[in-house]
Amino acid sequence: MFRVIPAIDLKDGKVVRLRQGKEDEVTFEATNPIEVAKQWVEIGAKVLHVIDLSGAFQGRLRHEEIIAEIAKMAEVQVGGGIRDFRVAERLFELGVDRVIFGTIAVERVEELREFAKKWKGRVMVAIDSKKGRVAVKGWKEVVELTPVQLAELYDDLDVSFLYTNIDVEGLVSGIERERIEEVVKSLRNPVYVAGGISSIEDIRFAKRVGAAGVVIGSALYTKKLKFEEAIKVEYEKV
């Protein structure tokens, strides 16, 4: 089932939106993450996408209690600073459904493959794309892998992928359609799309080319998109 998923980015105990993931470029802030999560679920969200930005910038999980509370409300996928498999298992203990791995997916391929075999269906590989190459370490470094090359290292396992185009992340400027279509159609496993989604048509496009869902942040928090409208695409024939 195609899912429209609100993003909840946590930084210093608050929900924030950052322009292109830059720590000092905050475009939205709310002080109560639990209330924000509750509002999305009440409107109809079945899945929530939670990123521990403090964790991503500092390399360790920082919002355990908030994440545990949110995990009681809906299906939850969590990422940000998860560079240790024990942390991932701790998240599963807290009730998290899927854990998102970024840097580890590039630097520790064999270990993550083994972990994914142990936790079938619960590993999500982040494919963060910057000008057609994969970015790691809080999007600060770019490696010589294309998004599809990274995904192919895991596509024979029971995993899912999160494809984020950093070039348009947080800009509410629309998506890069050819790149999304290429990634989705190259892979066997479910691909969720994030970065730049700013219209109902962007969501419909992702569904039409076979994405498993979309993650939306800035467009919802800046009110460019109404979640009540966006979620209807889950049930549309496109």
Curated annotation (Swiss-Prot):
Q: What is the lineage of its organism?
A: Archaea, Methanobacteriati, Methanobacteriota, Archaeoglobi, Archaeoglobales
| Gene name as annotated | hisA
Q: Which family does it belong to?
A: Belongs to the HisA/HisF family.
Q: Where is the active site?
A: D9 (proton acceptor), D128 (proton donor)
Among its keywords, does the record have Amino-acid biosynthesis?
yes
Where does it live in the cell?
Answer: Cytoplasm
Q: Name the pathway.
A: Amino-acid biosynthesis; L-histidine biosynthesis; L-histidine from 5-phospho-alpha-D-ribose 1-diphosphate: step 4/9
Q: What is this protein called?
A: 1-(5-phosphoribosyl)-5-[(5-phosphoribosylamino)methylideneamino] imidazole-4-carboxamide isomerase
Where mainly located? cytoplasm
Q: Which reaction does it catalyse?
A: 1-(5-phospho-beta-D-ribosyl)-5-[(5-phospho-beta-D-ribosylamino)methylideneamino]imidazole-4-carboxamide = 5-[(5-phospho-1-deoxy-D-ribulos-1-ylimino)methylamino]-1-(5-phospho-beta-D-ribosyl)imidazole-4-carboxamide
Listed GO cellular component terms?
Answer: cytoplasm
Q: From which source organism is this entry?
A: Archaeoglobus fulgidus (strain ATCC 49558 / DSM 4304 / JCM 9628 / NBRC 100126 / VC-16)
Q: Which Pfam families match?
A: His_biosynth
UniProt EC number: 5.3.1.16
